[in-house]
Regions:
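Extracellular beta-strand solenoid repeats
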Residues: 53, 76, 99, 122, ...
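Boundary at the C-terminal end of the N-terminal hydrophobic targeting segment
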Residues: 18-23, 27
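An edge-strand/N-cap motif at the start of beta-rich repeat modules
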Residues: 30-40
Length: 368
């Protein structure tokens, strides 16, 4: 965020006087000059010296100390635009400590060098913005803190009015970034904590987290891997707060492509994902040792697949929303085999049940 600087440059107050002869007196005198200016004050050797006031037809006025015809020491300068400077002068220019108040309500208090803001100081803007820190040639420079009235603040390094180096931003929405800056943007190593508690750590470029990084969720989930536009993109690993681990591909922040999920309870899946859900082909191993291999949709067996139960029984055939549904073959522990239709997990419709060579039934079934 760039802040428009106050118009800090001042008119140099060195006065070029005209005329041939000047009084040698140290007493107070009044002089008028060819440029229309008036000086009322003390002189020495024909030059303004001591204390006096110099004014111009355009409304400019300086009152303060003089040495050999120049404003040197403490004084007050009033400008035609309504701005007022009060402080130290050297050779007719603000030098040292001084403060200026602008007609629009803006203020600066601090160090000056040759009529420019330079060194440590405080700038206050009409809109409530406040900067405290270093300046060089009227620009923020060095260490400084900028605070806006909407809650935004930056504390850190500045180079010629631009955030450059190490710093911390507190955003108006509650987010916070700590890290490196280049050309007013997050650039380099840094950490961003969003308003909802998500933490993004890694290398930034032009304000965006790119390449490999870390994303920490408020619930304790931690992602390490490739990132694009602040989201998981590419290959990475998530360690979930419950102990589960996912290793694989991501797209736009979702598990997508091929990946492996290792559950803390012994569950295991390896296969395809889409928008964060198990979808496509894969193999699922359950904590009890059962294994399903086949097609999935929205985290459930859907399409063609085979399950081998922990006790050795099997089913090969169609599935719908995680349930045996359609044509398939079940092999039971007692040696029986059924081939035919299923509905909602039960034998339903036409099918054939056999038990070795001793039993065979071929016909219709209803609800198992």
């Amino acid at each position: 965020m760039r802040i428009k600087m106050l118009p800090f440059a001042l008119v140099v107050i060195t006065i070029a006087f005209c005329g041939a002869a000047y009084s040698q007196s140290l007493g107070e005198q009044t002089k008028q000059y060819e440029n229309g200016g008036f000086y009322k004050g003390t002189f020495k050797n024909g030059r303004q010296h001591g204390y006096g006031t110099y004014s111009l037809p355009n409304g400019y006025e300086y009152s303060g100390e003089w040495v050999n015809g120049q404003a040197v020491g403490e004084g007050i300068a009033k400008f035609s635009n309504g701005s007022i400077y009060e402080g130290a002068f050297i050779n007719g220019k603000p030098n040292g400590f001084g403060k200026i108040k602008y007609a629009d309500g803006g203020k600066y208090t601090g160090s000056w060098v040759d009529a420019q803001i330079d060194g440590q100081g405080v700038a206050e803007y009409p809109n409530g913005t406040r900067y405290t820190g270093g300046f060089s040639a009227n620009k923020y420079h060095g260490k400084g803190t900028l605070v806006l009235n909407n809650g935004y603040s930056y504390e850190g390094d500045w180079v010629n009015g631009i955030k450059e180096g190490q710093g911390t931003i507190n955003y108006a929405d509650g987010a916070m970034y700590t890290g490196q800056f280049v050309a007013d943007s997050r650039n380099g190593d840094g950490s961003l904590t969003t308003a909802d508690g998500i933490v993004l750590i890694g290398v930034w470029k032009k304000g965006e987290l790119i390449g490999k990084g870390t994303v920490k969720q408020p619930n304790g989930d931690i992602y390490n891997g490739e990132i694009k536009n602040g989201r998981q993109e590419g290959t990475g690993e998530v360690v979930y707060s419950n102990g589960d681990v996912y290793i694989g591909q991501f797209s736009n922040g979702f598990r997508q492509g091929s990946g492996e999920l290792i559950g803390a309870d012994g569950y295991h899946y390896i296969g395809n994902w889409f928008e964060g859900q198990i979808s496509g082909s894969g193999t699922e191993t359950y904590p009890d040792g059962s294994v399903y291999q086949g097609e999935f949709l929205a985290n459930l067996a859907d399409g063609k697949g085979k399950i081998t139960y922990a006790n050795g029984a099997t089913y090969v055939g169609n599935w719908k929303a995680g349930t045996v549904d359609g044509k398939g073959t079940s092999t039971y522990l007692n040696g029986m085999t059924y081939t035919g239709n299923f509905e909602n997990g039960k034998i339903h419709g036409f099918g054939v049940m056999t038990f070795g060579n001793s039993y065979r039934y071929e016909g219709n079934w209803k609800d198992g």
